[in-house]
Amino acid sequence: MAALASAQPGDQFHWDGKTLTTLHGPQWRLLLVGAGDIARYIAPMAMALGFEVIVCDPREEYAASWNVPGTRLLTTMPDDTVTALAPDIRTAIIVLAHDPKLDDMALLEALPSQAFFVGALGSRRTNAQRRKRLLEHFGFTEALVARLRGPVGLPIGSRTPPEIAVSILAELTQERIRHTTQSSTHPLQECGLLADDLERGAVRVAD
């Protein structure tokens, strides 16, 4: 027997021994913290790649000038935004605000989350200082800080906002492909169904 129900952020494939829950619909989300020029170039390209794009910026001057069709603009604080978004394994978060307070607020919630990609704009020096803050002031572990991709973007020598956006999306796409490939086991395996469940006929799987 099959039934449809509304999914919630954070829902995943799940098997409880009797019922298999699968997800259908939009699978990839991108949260951009900071509504500046680079975000304006990232957003339309990310949507073309199949991402739902959410932009967060509590600064009035940036929020007021955001006009990229198809995106969702939030003016809540970054930490609250990430928490409400409930990032899952199909969520990417990139901080672009150029404001340590806003960027750090987002990272404090993003790094411990299930997001498959967490990136931060800035120079190597800026990101080194950011990692130091996370370790020394916020008590993050080395493993959590190692999840941060910063400077975000593949090293293609980008300088202008469009070039930086391309480099960021290239790294994001690369990681999504790698993530998808590594998760290419059958969804039943991802949600904890053991091999012997299949062997004894507990569930019939159609390829």
Model-found features: residue ranges?
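Short hydrophobic/aromatic-enriched beta-strand-loop microsegments
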Residues: 73, 114-121, 142-146
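Short amphipathic alpha-helix with an adjacent loop that forms part of the alpha/beta core around
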Residues: 79-89
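Active-site capping/gating segments
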Residues: 123-124, 142-169, 173
